[in-house]
Every structure is written in structure tokens, then in C-alpha cells.
Amino acid sequence: MKKYDCLVIGAGHAGLEAAFILAKKKYKVALFVLDKKLVGNMPCNPSIGGPAKGIVTREIDALGGMQAIAADNTQLQMKLLNSSKGAGTWALRAQIDKLEYSKWFLNRIEENEYIDLIDKEVNSIKFVNQKVCGVYTVDNQFFESNYLIVTTGTFLDSSIHIGHKVIKKGPDDFNGSYLLAKQIKELDFQTIRLKTGTPPRILKNSIDYSKLQIEPGTNKKYSFSHFDRKFLDFNKQEVCYLAFTNNKIHEIINNNLDKSAMYSGFITGTGPRYCPSIEDKVVRFNDKERHQLFVEPESKHLDTIYLGGLSSSLPEDVQEQIVKNIVGFENAVIKKYAYAIEYDAINPIQLYPTLETKKIKGLFFAGQINGTSGYEEAACQGLMAGINVLCQLENREPLVLKRNEAYIGVLIEDLINKEITDPYRLLTSRAEYRLELRNDNADQRLLKYGYELGLISQSHWDEYNKNLENFNNTLKELETSTLKNVKEFKYNSRKTNTTLYEILKRPDYSFIDMEPFLKNKNTLDEYWKDKVDIYIKYGGYIKSQQKIINDTKNIDNIKLSSISDYKDVPNISLEARDKLNKVKPLTLGQASRVSGINLVDLINIKLYLENKKKQT
């Protein structure tokens, strides 16, 4: 028998964050994995980041987590998304070398004396008086601890579906977790059956890239990590490509829907609304002449590409027809066929905001087992579960992030308060405070918590505070520098008392234009210069946003009887339209309690009603 401070089941994105954050405080962790090849595995898209998700990765970094550093060290391409839009929507996305990513984490585990990686299946959890005592592995070894974090991902009672074939396996043909799934049900935890999928992998050298649209990275130095920054030169970055479906492909799919596991009743689990299979896209969006497909490298060491956007549960022969009808893929060779995977998840309303279960003390669930989708959503849950175990070990107050502090706070509050019916994906539209939850300010929002918990080093904290002081001094100087006393700055205005701060609010000016006229000009690096621009330009919008949010109070008195079809309401999500048209709530308060409806939807419904009232 071995005793540990905490046990973690699963070494995917959630499990790794949980283990490393505890090890950072020198707590001994046993990290269980079915196979060492599954450490940091990316069974689907080989990327980190994206809208909202890339900001989560930076939030993880600000709290002392690992994902940002791992992604920076194993990137194949880095891209700033939505750069033509406002900074509130900016997010980083890195194409990752999936083999190097796993290897990077394995090396970090080997170097860490506080993490024991144990490649054994856990088949049962031991409890006494509704408290965790430890776990048994399949060879009947017992590992003792008062804390257990379960991060089994999509492995819990998993089944692979290709056409009408059903295989009791986990992702990437690894074994699933069936004994543990059985015990969780026997403990009367409410479970839900979910489904996700992955597209085919194609041999790189069988594609005619001249027929595809090039998608390069961003030619500027960006990193997920705030301190351990590592950049990949633009000329060394891998190129991605865009391809498209066409009417012939749509015809093939429609003619073979009876062979799809999803459409022939073989799958009962609900699939992800925001990452539908190609069958779903063709059926649900039958007015579309084509759908985008993303041609992305998986690793420098692999001969395959990932064909994003073509996830499917159709049989192999139909997949062959589909792929060969994509322009540029006429001679393509499929090395690994697409499949759907069905698995058990926990209904997360059974959790506290700390991710500890209400039923059993010391038992935490984190990651896709809580009904989420995506590596970033999983990683942040693992981090928060690990931090809250740490808080209990040190008799601290739990760390529960608010919705206006982090996307992590939005995610966890949504999970524990709203019924999950399909895999939950973070979206910018879910965050009512999204102008405050930006890519550029994760450190300003969260670094203090990481430092207080001892998860951020003193040197990094000192570096941050020095930069913050320079940032604040720059803002003060911009506020006090007027056209009258900065005559060298050419600006067409008769008001000589106009400050550079006021001018910088305009979209056609940036901090670079002001910098030559400031005494503080040499103390900020590029990252903090961008912060100055964004802070000033978004100040007014953030105040307006807060006013609108405050106006949604007392929403139970706002009646919705005048709305016959929510398709008429602009700027609400498709999910909101679908669900509100089904439920037909009587008041805005009732609408707020419908799963999948967020504050942004409520604000836009209220604005619609106000505008409608003005017109009558």
C-alpha cells in the first residue's frame, strides 16, 4: 500500500494540470493512465486555443498551469484569430505537434519527483463514511489518499462507431474504462450519454496542395505563456490549408444516411452542437453549397494530416467516396478512418463550484467527464480541481473564480448550474463580461491568485509588478499630456487642452503614434504597449457593457408574450433560438433558467422588446 496526498485518474489535459499544480507545492501525486502513450494525447484536433479557448489557456498560465508553456514549446504554427475585429474577440490558436506535446509532458513527469506515473487501470474507488480513502487497480493494488480527482475524458464506458460497427474501445483504439464506469453508476451518480467524433487522417503526400487555399500563421511574435515565452519564427511555421465540400459530396452523404451510426439509431448519446459531424452539417444546413474543411499537420514525425470539419460515423467505403470527391484529394489515401465515440459523463450539477462532488467528500471530477468538449476546457477544470484540493490540504478558502474574472469562471458556473444536454463548448457569447475577459489581460485578472497560492514564482511576480507600474505611469502621462504641452504632436484640433489619452481613444491612432512624445517610452515591451492601446480604447465600451448588465436585473417581470418566433430576435445564438422556440417561456426570468441561454442572449431579447415597444 502506498499513501499519496492526491490521486489523479487519467493523464490527459485535465489530469496533467491537476497533477502538476499539486506537485508545484510539493504534494505527492499518483497519476494513473491506461497507457503511457495517452499522456497529453490529442485524439482529435492537434491544436490548442481558438475563440475563448485560447484565452482560457492564458488564464491557466496566469494561475500557474502548464498548457500554455507546453503549447509554446511544441507549436507548428501560431495564429492570432479575429485580428481584423476588436481586441475583445482576439484569441491565439496554435497548431501543435501532437507527438512532441505528449513527449514534452512525459519528460516533465520524469523530472518531477512529486509525480508518480502509474500505467494501471483503476477499477474501483474506496470510501468510508462518504469520504474518499483510496483506489484499487485491476491487479488489486491499493493506493491510499483522502483526495481523488477523476479525469477519465471520453474513456468512461466508451464505444467506437463506424457505420453499423460498434467496438468497445476508447479513443485512438485504446481500451476504455468500464469497471470504473460501472461503479460510478452504482454509487447513484447521475450520468449522461454523450457523443463526439473525429475526422479521417490522410497521407500527406497523396494530396494536391496546389488546388487548396493556403492558411498561413500570423507573422508576429505571439506566445500563450506570459513569462516562459517561446516563439517559432514565421518562416519555420507549418502551413495549413483550406478545402471545401461540394454538391457531389452532399449527395453521397444524403444517399447514405441510413448507414451512419448517428442517423440509423446506433448512437443514443447527444453530439456537440458546435462541432457537428459532416452528416449533421449537410442535413441541418441543407441550403449551404459547401462547408469548409481544414487541412492541418499532426506532427513532424507523422505522414498524415488532420482533415478538420469532416468528422463522421459513416462506413469506410462511404468515407472513401467523400474524400476522393474533395478538390485536391482525388488521389488521397485514408490512413485512419473517421469514427464517432459514445461515452458516459457526469451530470455536473452534482458538483460544488470547486468541482468536488456533493455526494462524497474528497472526490473531484474534472474535464470531459463533466460534459465539456475541448482540451482547453478540460485543462482548466483539472487545474481548478487541483487548486481546490491544494486549498483543502492547506486549510485555505477555496478558489472559485467569478464570471467577470475569467472564462474559467463562466465555464464552471454554467456547468454546475445549468443542465448539460450536449458537450459544452466555451464561446465568447457565453461571457457577458467578454470585453473584460480579453487575451491581453489574463495576467492582470488572475496572476494575484496564482501568487497568493504560491503557484507563481517571486521573480515572475516582481517582473509583472514592474511592468504594471510602468503601464500605470504611462497611462497617467497620457492623461496629463495635452496638445498644448506636446506641440510636436500634429493633431487637427483647436482644443489645446485635449489629452493624448483622449486622442488614443480614436480608432485611427495607436500608442506607437504617441510613444515618441512620452518620457516613459522606453520602459514598455511590445506586449505591454498593446495593453495600453486596448485599455484606453475599450474603457468606454466596458462601462456601457456594465450598464446593460445592470439593466437586466428584475427580469422576472419582463413578459415575452409578444415574441412568437425567436428567429425574429437579432443577435441571439442559434442554440437560444432553438431552445426558446421549444420551451416558450412566459418571462425573461424563465428564459434565463433554460439550459444554453446566457446573459448575452437575455440582453439582446430585452433590447429587441424595447425597440419593438418604441416602434408601436
From Swiss-Prot:
Principal cellular location given in the protein's record: cytoplasm
GO CC terms in record: cytosol
Positions of NAD(+) binding: 271-285
Record InterPro entries: FAD/NAD-bd_sf (IPR036188), GIDA_C_N (IPR049312), MnmG (IPR004416), MnmG-rel (IPR002218), MnmG-rel_CS (IPR020595), MnmG_C (IPR026904), MnmG_C_subdom (IPR047001), MnmG_C_subdom_sf (IPR044920)
GO MF terms, alphabetically ordered: flavin adenine dinucleotide binding
Cofactor(s) the record lists: FAD
Subcellular location: Cytoplasm
Keywords, alphabetical: Cytoplasm, FAD, Flavoprotein, NAD, tRNA processing
Pfam families in the record: GIDA, GIDA_C_1st, SAM_GIDA_C
GO biological process, one term: tRNA methylation
Binding-site residues for FAD, renumbered to this chain: G10, A11, G12, H13, A14, G15, V122, S177, Q368
Assembly mode: Homodimer. Heterotetramer of two MnmE and two MnmG subunits.
Entry similarity comment: Belongs to the MnmG family.
PANTHER family per UniProt: GLUCOSE INHIBITED DIVISION PROTEIN A, PROTEIN MTO1 HOMOLOG, MITOCHONDRIAL
Biological role: NAD-binding protein involved in the addition of a carboxymethylaminomethyl (cmnm) group at the wobble position (U34) of certain tRNAs, forming tRNA-cmnm(5)s(2)U34.
Protein name: tRNA uridine 5-carboxymethylaminomethyl modification enzyme MnmG
Underlying gene: mnmG
